[in-house]
Amino acid sequence: LRKIKDIAHKYKLLEPIIGGDTRHESVYNALTFLKKDAPEFVLVHDSARPIVTKKVLENLIESINLNYTCVIPILPLNDSIRSAYNNEIHEVVNRQDKVIVQTPQLCNYKELVKAHKNNIEIYEDESSLLMSKGIKIMTVEGDPRSLKITYENDFKLLEPYLTNNSKYITVIGNGFDI
């Protein structure tokens, strides 16, 4: 931790904040650390998503003036969804209004602190915590490359994005359906 603090000092970064046992505790620790110089907005990102694109950040930042407390990147859900337990399918879920939620999530600092303050429930992310308090959440376009590392095999999916990309070329073409 000392070495990380030294690096942060050298590059004039905020010093690292010790996380908690849960996401809620870790985010709250970070929010508390920022209290002295409270920003208007914060971006909360989980380290399980190592790829954040400039476009997603631009989408979030451009939305600041739209008077939402929280803005999140989303992707449409392409796969079929089912509810299953005990090795049986029990329900077909309509995917038409379902989306994949990503991070970073842009939140109003004061509202997020207020939501975290006396909260004992566990929420998957900041948008679900704020929604539980009756706050409407805005969405912007996410990026499919912002994969979440949950299982060991997920690292293999990320390899093309994290290794030398010189073997990849950009090809632009036109096409049409007949």
Segments (PLM) and residue ranges:
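Alpha-helical transmembrane bundles and membrane-interface segments of multipass inner-membrane proteins
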Residues: K136-T139, D143-S146, N153-D154, L158-K167
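RNase III-family endoribonuclease catalytic core
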Residues: V56, P160-I178
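Active-site-adjacent loop/tail segments of enzyme domains
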Residues: I18-D21, S47-V56
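Conserved N-terminal catalytic core of the sugar/cofactor nucleotidyltransferase
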Residues: L1-P39
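Conserved core of the sugar-phosphate nucleotidyltransferase
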Residues: K3, I51-V140
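Structural signal for short hydrophobic segments within the conserved structured cores
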Residues: L14-I17, V99, M138, L147-K148
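Short aromatic/hydrophobic "clamp" motif used to bind/position activated sugar donors
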Residues: V42-L43
